[in-house]
Regions:
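Divalent metal-binding segments
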Residues: 3-9, 14, 18-256
């Protein structure tokens, strides 16, 4: 008989099995479930080295199967400044400055989850707003849906799009009446020139289009990218995801 390495008991287990939708205990050996049932059924699988956890009535679910993920970009995103809940210049400016100071060699400071109404209801975010927050380092803010980004003046200049650029249908570098970019960039092709300023060179999102790095990454870059992927997987596991569907990729990512 195989003894359990782990037993969880006194739980409310949702089995997803129509024949037995609920149970109160389960046993694990190695990385596999070996039994699901009630306390009396599972107790006999305990050995002297079995870890026994009293769930105290808490719910236990099967691992979640995630349906659509971009793991490399998501792992990279864990390093970025999160702006969820940030409103107005008074809140934004100190966060951006601290982020810049903590990343002195980064070619582009990227912030995630920026509110479309960051500077107030109905007020379109512009490069001038971002220049007030941080004028001396390239900055780009991404909306939560990743369909819009906003960049400050120095970022637009270095990306070569301050005077605008031709874009595919559906993508736009939004222009002001004076013929200069406002800072609003609609869809990925519009903000891709700014993303290219990243110190990483954008290896983390090449898989969106199945592209490979133009120059083979060196050992240090590979180690950094492997760490990024590992951090992404650990983040998923911490929230109960045991399987994911990675919706982008290339041979470089596959090799990692």
């Amino acid at each position: 008989m195989t003894l359990a390495d782990l037993i969880i008991e006194n739980a409310s287990i949702l089995t997803m099995d129509t024949a037995r939708p609920r149970a109160t205990a389960l046993a694990v050996a190695g990385n596999r479930l070996i039994a699901v049932g009630d306390g009396a059924d599972i107790a006999g699988l305990a050995g002297p080295d079995t870890l026994r956890i009293n769930a105290q009535g808490c719910t236990v679910l099967p691992g979640f199967i995630e349906a659509h993920m971009h793991l490399f970009w998501g792992g990279y995103g864990l390093k970025l400044l999160q702006l969820s809940g940030v409103q107005g210049l008074a809140q934004l400016a100190p966060k951006l400055r601290a982020y810049a100071d903590a990343n002195p060699t980064e070619g582009l400071l990227i912030c995630k989850a920026a509110d479309y109404n960051l500077f107030g209801p109905g007020i379109a975010t512009t490069r001038q707003h971002l220049d007030q927050a941080l004028p001396d380092r390239p900055v780009m803010l991404l909306s939560s849906d990743h369909h819009t980004a906003w960049a400050n003046t120095i970022a637009l200049e270095r990306a070569g799009i301050l005077q605008g650029a031709d874009m595919p249908v559906g993508c736009e570098v939004v222009m002001a009446p004076d013929g200069m970019a406002t800072g609003e960039l609609r869809e990925q092709f519009a903000y891709a020139p700014v993303l290219a300023l990243r110190t990483s060179g954008g290896r983390e999102d090449l898989g969106f289009a199945g592209q490979e790095p133009a120059t083979p990454p060196n050992a240090a870059e590979r180690a950094e990218d492997l760490h990024t992927l590992s951090q992404g997987l650990q983040y998923c596991a911490a929230f109960g995801f045991t399987s994911i569907h990675n919706m982008d990729g290339n041979f470089y990512q596959l090799a990692l």
